Amino acid sequence: MPPVVGKKAKKGILERLNAGEIVIGDGGFVFALEKRGYVKAGPWTPEAAVEHPEAVRQLHREFLRAGSNVMQTFTFYASEDKLENRGNYVLEKISGQKVNEAACDIARQVADEGDALVAGGVSQTPSYLSCKSETEVKKVFLQQLEVFMKKNVDFLIAEYFEHVEEAVWAVETLIASGKPVAATMCIGPEGDLHGVPPGECAVRLVKAGASIIGVNCHFDPTISLKTVKLMKEGLEAARLKAHLMSQPLAYHTPDCNKQGFIDLPEFPFGLEPRVATRWDIQKYAREAYNMGIRYIGGCCGFEPYHIRAIAEELAPERGFLPPASEKHGSWGSALDMHTKPWVRARARKEYWENLRIASGRPYNPSMSKPDGWGVTKGTAELMQQKEATTEQQLKELFEKQKFKLQ
């Protein structure tokens, strides 16, 4: 598509990264919109792009104002098999095409309000978990890709994959578009759910055609950066090159196992005590930058103020602050205007950097014991279905959970 007359053409994602620029991603949509009443926890599907476009648009705008350079289409779990999984009505009543098209239109509208790019995103599928063939799974990705091509997104992201095999299938499908492809996996230092180490995952993704690789979701910034470091080492050992990307959770997960925060008993409705502070995220941004990561964003739990923290921490390198910083004093400096003297005394970096945050929950533990069911692709409980989950199926799961808790 030719550039609009009178409008300066935006630099592409690889042009920016190849020049050493910092690209700031956006934050988490499904969790943020679930809290606001627009997404249903459980299926986590993005029909809000059609049903409540104003809510999706506003969240995009807040991330843009906070400093995001990329507007990811709100197409997480927007594959047709997911939109009809376990009794979901979206495919039948709305259609996958309408959801994906609406998400693209909203992202483009907001991206063009600033210097942001639009990334069309696909994620893991019920088809893969149910042991469908490579051809069948790739067909699911292709349905979304056709919409992304029609809407002329700037680049593509294959994100949130627990198995590198499926992530590779996604990259191989997306790369046929001729557009740059990024690929992120929701894995920790132990690797994917089939035991493939992070370094090998990175090598496979790059060989499949990804220009940008890394992690997203499931783990906190500290664990995620350890995983990206292993990916980087894997690429170096294989003499392969790719740009690095990190979009972790905004929840602290030191007690997670291989499955990440989904295994925590608090998932998804009791995670608030684990939320990272803006100062935690500034530390994450600096560590990511020092590691050589240049695409830095967030996933579930990341609100616009977290993205602003990334933009503020890296402002010296980028040369500017985001618009949202107009109402935010650096390291709490605006607290010098507070009426209470002890709060004015907190208007300094040293205070917030060294504060040990209390939870306010005196009888609660600091750590949890993950559920650890150990299920992965091919396990009976992970086989997906079009019909709603039955009472008998739930009863069996409740009994299994009781046994695990004993």
From Swiss-Prot:
Which residues carry the post-translational modification N6-succinyllysine, per the record?
A: 40, 93, 98, 232, 241, 340, 377
What SUPFAM superfamilies does the record point to?
Homocysteine S-methyltransferase
Localization per Swiss-Prot or TrEMBL: Cytoplasm, Cytosol; Nucleus
Residues annotated for Zn(2+) binding in this entry? 217, 299-300
Any signal peptide, and if so, which residues?
A: none
Record's GO cellular component terms: cytosol; extracellular exosome; nucleus
EC number(s) per UniProt?
Answer: 2.1.1.5
The UniProt note on the cofactor reads as follows:
Binds 1 zinc ion per subunit.
According to the UniProt entry, which residues carry Phosphoserine? 330
Q: Domain Hcy-binding spans what residues?
A: 11-314
Per UniProt, which keywords does this protein have? Cytoplasm, Metal-binding, Methyltransferase, Nucleus, Phosphoprotein, Transferase, Zinc
Which branch of life, at top level? Eukaryota
Per the annotation, which location comes first and is thus the protein's main one? cytoplasm
Q: In which pathway does it act?
A: Amine and polyamine degradation; betaine degradation; sarcosine from betaine: step 1/2; Amino-acid biosynthesis; L-methionine biosynthesis via de novo pathway; L-methionine from L-homocysteine (BhmT route): step 1/1
- Listed GO MF terms: betaine-homocysteine S-methyltransferase activity; zinc ion binding
Reaction(s) the record says it catalyses = L-homocysteine + glycine betaine = N,N-dimethylglycine + L-methionine
Top-level EC class: transferase
Which cofactors are named for this entry?
Answer: Zn(2+)
GO BP terms, alphabetized: 'de novo' L-methionine biosynthetic process; amino-acid betaine catabolic process; L-methionine salvage; methylation
How does the annotation summarize its subunit structure? Homotetramer.
User: What's this protein's function?
Assistant: Involved in the regulation of homocysteine metabolism. Converts betaine and homocysteine to dimethylglycine and methionine, respectively. This reaction is also required for the irreversible oxidation of choline.
Q: Which named protein is this?
A: Betaine--homocysteine S-methyltransferase 1
Q: Which organism is it from?
A: Pongo abelii (Sumatran orangutan)
